[in-house]
Amino acid sequence: MEVILLERIAKLGQMGETVKVRDGFARNYLLPLGKALRANAANKARFESERSTLEARNLERKSEAQKVADSLDGKSFIIVRSAGETGQLYGSVAARDIVETLAAEGFNINRNQVDLNQPIKAIGLHKVTLHLHGEVDVAIEINVARSAEEAERQAKGESLTSADAIYGVDEDALKPEDFFNPEAELESEEE
């Protein structure tokens, strides 16, 4: 199906371009959300008559998104979750959790604006991209930890999943002899 784009859409085209897309993408996403019109003679004429208002509205949305991006840029947000000793989460952190955390901080972001290929399943610092507008993206840092104190330690660069953090043992100081001493086993068998 051919459609006329009413705004810039990543990996598809600029506002005003006529592009060919799959029928389902047009019917289920582009047309219901008002991001495109079917490419027929009546809609082409309608688009040309409304082009200046669409461009002004798009510019306004972009400036609003840029303001939000400027306030979010480089910020870190803490999400506290239960996790095992190795840092594996009991569950995961999904886009919905990130949106809730941002909403608690006063940012109104939709779940579909969070670029998260797969849920976060381990504690640590994770970079997440937010697509606020077709031309405005911002990267934020999500600090997933077991507690607020651990989040502060992680932010300072401390690893919470190393042997030292878990068991109080320095990984570099361990020698193979500490794990397996064949002579000690022989001595215990002789006794």
UniProtKB/Swiss-Prot annotation:
Keyword Ribonucleoprotein: yes
Region (Disordered): 171-191
Family: Belongs to the bacterial ribosomal protein bL9 family.
A Gene Ontology molecular function term of the record: structural constituent of ribosome
Keywords (A to Z) from UniProt: Ribonucleoprotein, Ribosomal protein, RNA-binding, rRNA-binding
HAMAP family, per database record: Ribosomal_bL9
Protein name listed in UniProt: Large ribosomal subunit protein bL9
One Pfam family cited in the UniProt record for this chain: Ribosomal_L9_C
Origin superkingdom: Bacteria
Organism: Rhizobium meliloti (strain 1021)
Gene3D superfamilies noted in UniProt: Ribosomal protein L9, C-terminal domain (3.10.430.100), Ribosomal protein L9, N-terminal domain (3.40.5.10)
Summary of the function given for this chain in its UniProt record: Binds to the 23S rRNA.
GO terms for biological process, alphabetical: translation
Gene Ontology CC annotations of this record: ribonucleoprotein complex; ribosome
